[in-house]
Curated annotation (Swiss-Prot):
<dbReference type="GO" id="GO:0003999">
    <property type="term" value="F:adenine phosphoribosyltransferase activity"/>
</dbReference>
<dbReference type="Pfam" id="PF00156">
    <property type="entry name" value="Pribosyltran"/>
</dbReference>
<dbReference type="GO" id="GO:0016208">
    <property type="term" value="F:AMP binding"/>
</dbReference>
<comment type="pathway">
    <text>Purine metabolism; AMP biosynthesis via salvage pathway; AMP from adenine: step 1/1.</text>
</comment>
<dbReference type="InterPro" id="IPR000836">
    <property type="entry name" value="PRibTrfase_dom"/>
</dbReference>
<keyword id="KW-0328">Glycosyltransferase</keyword>
<dbReference type="InterPro" id="IPR005764">
    <property type="entry name" value="Ade_phspho_trans"/>
</dbReference>
<comment type="function">
    <text>Catalyzes a salvage reaction resulting in the formation of AMP, that is energically less costly than de novo synthesis.</text>
</comment>
<dbReference type="GO" id="GO:0044209">
    <property type="term" value="P:AMP salvage"/>
</dbReference>
<dbReference type="GO" id="GO:0005737">
    <property type="term" value="C:cytoplasm"/>
</dbReference>
<dbReference type="InterPro" id="IPR029057">
    <property type="entry name" value="PRTase-like"/>
</dbReference>
<dbReference type="GO" id="GO:0006168">
    <property type="term" value="P:adenine salvage"/>
</dbReference>
<keyword id="KW-0808">Transferase</keyword>
<protein>
    <recommendedName>
        <fullName>Adenine phosphoribosyltransferase</fullName>
        <ecNumber>2.4.2.7</ecNumber>
    </recommendedName>
</protein>
<keyword id="KW-0660">Purine salvage</keyword>
<dbReference type="GO" id="GO:0002055">
    <property type="term" value="F:adenine binding"/>
</dbReference>
<comment type="subunit">
    <text>Homodimer.</text>
</comment>
Length: 175
């Protein structure tokens, strides 16, 4: 797999956005001509290894769009964007979730999925799990099934995996 390559392209930026935070910057990975493809291929291999066979991909705004579309292309699947409020033109479901500094919301179209869909959630980072859990809650409002969640990287110490207990969660790189 391409995990060493992927990890080598994620820059560690200390004290961003505030002192004491080690920010993991994916822009070098995206800037590399092979970065996005190798990441999507590694995600596809992880799904194959775990026997996860989604019928459609959901990506969370905004970096989940990047990796979600790339993975959808590799797997030959469709892609559904999970958006911030007010960005989708038709009837939506909305879920509010808590952040460390307040709250936010996510939305999807009410007709985004069929009840028979096996939805894979894709995002760049699993930290506290709040955004991922809100995305799962949105998908379940449509009566579709969550096949699993996959992330480029996971910050183990923040407990996101525990928030998603009961779901099939994968991360390519753990910090």
């Amino acid at each position: 797999m391409n995990l060493d390559f992927i990890k080598s392209k994620i820059a560690a930026v200390p004290d961003f956005p505030k002192p004491g935070i080690m920010f993991r910057d994916i822009t070098p990975l995206l800037a590399d001509p092979q970065g996005l493809r190798k990441t999507a291929e590694a995600m596809a291999q992880e799904l194959k290894n775990k026997g996860i066979q989604p019928t459609i991909i959901a990506g969370t705004e905004s970096r989940g769009f990047i990796f979600g579309v790339a993975l959808a292309e590799v797997l030959g699947l469709g892609f559904v964007p999970v958006r911030k409020p007010g960005k989708l033109p038709r009837a939506t479901y909305s879920v509010k979730y808590d952040l460390e500094y307040g709250s936010d919301s996510l939305e999807i179209h009410q007709d985004a999925f069929k009840v028979t869909d096996e939805v894979l959630v894709v995002d760049d980072l699993l930290a506290t799990g709040g955004t991922a859990k809100a995305t799962v809650d949105l998908i379940e409002k449509t009566q579709a099934k969550v096949a699993g969640l996959i992330f480029v990287m996971e910050l183990d110490s923040l407990g996101g995996r525990e928030v998603l207990a009961g779901y099939n969660v994968s991360a390519l790189i753990k910090f």
